[in-house]
């Protein structure tokens, strides 16, 4: 299925929930973008809801939930969600990843790490691995050079051979033990925290992302949007986004928000 231009997505009052990937969707050239942050504030000030859905680690997600204008954060590709109540000054944390963090999981992740780094010596352990609870993040282009997108998919394939779920993002290959993903936990969050029914999800939620680890979301939500830099990944996707922005990265995020608020 070929993606449609963004103007084919008709804004409606029922579109109350914007779920968005972070790296290379909400960021521009690996940094927070002032226009994207302004767009997120405008979305929230319109009375609507925003939830970040990211592969980034628990330590970062605590910060996102506290400091950003979002209702909640789904992190480590669906291992958990965090939701900060500013009035009560309390963080709600729900962990859905299995197995639970601990020494046994740490040993299994280290074994997978050692295998990948031995077989793909140009790859590196992600710099944010120390802040993760559930998954292994292999850096193929954030802080390293010399690896291609094809290499990233080879790494993901090898991790699957080791019995892990593996997804390629725009910067990392993330792998974990268990069946959760961005979609399963997004549905759980929306149903538990906002009371949405399965039927309501289809017309209430807009999702925007940029890479193969967003594919479960692109498949699940009819109102799925890819920022323009998703295009190199489309040949690797069985379930592409339904709509595409003309701009890449954060500029595409701004384009989407402006379109929905028009």
Where are these regions (language model features)?
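Mg2+-dependent phosphoryl-transfer enzymes with acidic/Ser/Thr/Gly-rich catalytic loops
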Residues: 8-9, 13, 33, 183-262
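Conserved acidic, metal-coordinating active-site core of Asp-based
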Residues: 112-206, 211-220
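Short, structured coil segments at secondary-structure junctions
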Residues: 68-69, 77, 162, 220-221, ...
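Active-site phosphate-binding/coordination module
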Residues: 32-128
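Residue-level marker for buried hydrophobic side chains located in beta-strands
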Residues: 18-20, 73, 207
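Non-catalytic pre-domain segments flanking phosphatase-related domains
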Residues: 1-20
């Amino acid at each position: 299925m070929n993606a449609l231009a963004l103007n084919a997505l008709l804004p409606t009052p029922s579109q109350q929930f914007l779920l968005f990937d972070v790296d290379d969707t909400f960021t521009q050239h690996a940094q927070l973008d002032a226009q994207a942050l302004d767009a997120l504030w405008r979305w929230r000030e319109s009375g609507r809801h925003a939830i970040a859905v990211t592969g980034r680690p628990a330590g970062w997600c605590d910060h996102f939930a506290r400091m950003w204008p979002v209702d909640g954060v789904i992190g480590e590709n669906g291992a958990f969600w965090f939701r900060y109540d500013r009035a009560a000054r309390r963080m709600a944390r729900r962990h859905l990843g299995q197995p639970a963090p601990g020494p046994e999981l740490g040993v299994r992740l280290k074994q997978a790490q050692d295998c990948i780094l031995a077989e793909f010596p140009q790859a590196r352990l992600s710099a944010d691995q120390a802040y993760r609870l559930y998954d292994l993040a292999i850096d193929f282009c954030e802080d390293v050079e010399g690896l291609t997108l094809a290499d990233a998919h080879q790494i993901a394939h090898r991790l699957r051979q080791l019995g892990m779920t593996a997804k390629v993002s725009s910067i990392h290959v993330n792998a974990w033990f268990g069946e959760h993903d961005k979609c399963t936990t997004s549905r759980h969050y929306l149903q538990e925290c906002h009371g949405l029914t399965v039927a309501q999800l289809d017309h209430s939620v807009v999702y925007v992302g940029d890479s193969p680890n967003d594919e479960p979301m692109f498949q699940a939500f009819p109102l799925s949007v890819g920022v323009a830099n998703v295009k190199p990944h489309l040949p690797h996707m069985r379930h592409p986004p339904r709509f595409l922005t003309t701009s890449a990265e954060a500029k595409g995020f701004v384009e989407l928000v402006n379109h929905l608020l028009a």
